[in-house]
Amino acid sequence: MSALYDNEAKIRQAVGMLQKIVNDTSVPRNIRRAATDAIRNLQDQTLSPAVRAANAIGILEEISQDPNMPMHTRIAIWNVVSMLETVKD
């Protein structure tokens, strides 16, 4: 059971980091919208933690290629993706 709690802790930490991006007004609106979508996917309790993480990673990797993204936001997204890649069922 500890793996499940560990996965949930990682997901909660990722949501917190994404929430900072959503609240940062220097980040373009489309990137904040993608971060909001990733948060929504991470909080969907009907799916397993690994599926939720994979869905969020897909959204974040797609948006991380945006040339309008500030560098500090890109690094934060890469950190979130790295954390979510460790979530396993």
Swiss-Prot record:
Top-rank lineage group of the source organism: Archaea
Entries under Pfam families matching the protein: UPF0147
Signal peptide feature range: none
NCBIfam families for this protein: PRK04330.1
Family according to the record: Belongs to the UPF0147 family.
Protein name: UPF0147 protein Saci_0891
Organism in which the protein naturally occurs: Sulfolobus acidocaldarius (strain ATCC 33909 / DSM 639 / JCM 8929 / NBRC 15157 / NCIMB 11770)
